[in-house]
Amino acid sequence: MSKDDLIQFTGTVLELLPNATFRVKLENDHVIIAHTSGRMRKNRIRILLGDKVMVEMTPYDLTKGRVIHRH
């Protein structure tokens, strides 16, 4: 799957879960589980409750995603 197939949404962090995982409410009111991308882990970018984040999702599973940017 290429990067062109990925869907990007903006959302807000609702809950912090273990292992760098978050419950995120998207702009279209869907709630998903998202984990931190490897580049954000490597650079130790912290994500806190209430942060606006950019989430990347695959069209095959719309319940999970990857946090790629923090606003």
Curated annotation (Swiss-Prot):
Cell division in keyword set: no
Signal peptide: none
GO terms for cellular component: cytosol
Highest taxon listed in the record's lineage: Bacteria
Alphabetically ordered keywords of this record: Cytoplasm, Initiation factor, Protein biosynthesis, RNA-binding, rRNA-binding
Broad class of the protein's primary localization: cytoplasm
Cellular compartment(s): Cytoplasm
Pfam families: eIF-1a (PF01176)
Role noted for this protein: One of the essential components for the initiation of protein synthesis. Stabilizes the binding of IF-2 and IF-3 on the 30S subunit to which N-formylmethionyl-tRNA(fMet) subsequently binds. Helps modulate mRNA selection, yielding the 30S pre-initiation complex (PIC). Upon addition of the 50S ribosomal subunit IF-1, IF-2 and IF-3 are released leaving the mature 70S translation initiation complex.
Family classification: Belongs to the IF-1 family.
NCBIfam families to which the protein is assigned, alphabetical: infA (TIGR00008)
Subunit note: Component of the 30S ribosomal translation pre-initiation complex which assembles on the 30S ribosome in the order IF-2 and IF-3, IF-1 and N-formylmethionyl-tRNA(fMet); mRNA recruitment can occur at any time during PIC assembly.
Protein name (Swiss-Prot/TrEMBL): Translation initiation factor IF-1
